[in-house]
Amino acid sequence: MDTLLNALSSDQEQMKAWRHHLHRHPELAFDEHGTARYIAELLRGWGYEVSEGIGRTGVVARMRCGDGTKSIGLRADTDALAVQEMSDSDHKSTVEGRSHTCGHDGHSAMLLGAARYLARTRAFNGTVNLIFQPAEEIMGGAVAMIEDGLFERFPMDAVFGMHNMPKLERGKLYFTAG
């Protein structure tokens, strides 16, 4: 794990820049059009096959490497909340009454960091699918993507999602089946 963290440390400032961009431009559930375009453009630039509009405003990016037959999914959420941000930070929301107060900007930035690392190193043998899910806050985005054929169009043996949890010990990963 230390080797991976060291490899990603050179991208730390870029990941912050992605997060700050997303934080300044929050979009509510099923209205993440600008977010989807931004993410898709980055992923295409790194060589991913990108599909937009999955489940209305979701993005799925796929990369194959080697001759492996396993296919995994890595998932992050993209929507913001209808909450006024009270921060004075330089990357404060520019949209009145909307903000990324639940951390989905961070989730997306972390998955973009993983995407760039995987594209650069191709450190896997099989297929990786990056799932940028809309509308997590209203609990409709996953269903919309599944009903839009997510798993038929992008077969996966396993999907890994994540959520940042500020109260958990820094530098630790916690897993649960689900």
Language model features with spans:
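Acidic/His- and Gly-rich active-site-bordering loop/insert found
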Residues: 2-100, 109-112, 116-124
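Histidine/acidic-residue-rich, glycine-tolerant segments that coordinate divalent metal ions
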Residues: 59-60, 81-83, 87-99, 105-106, ...
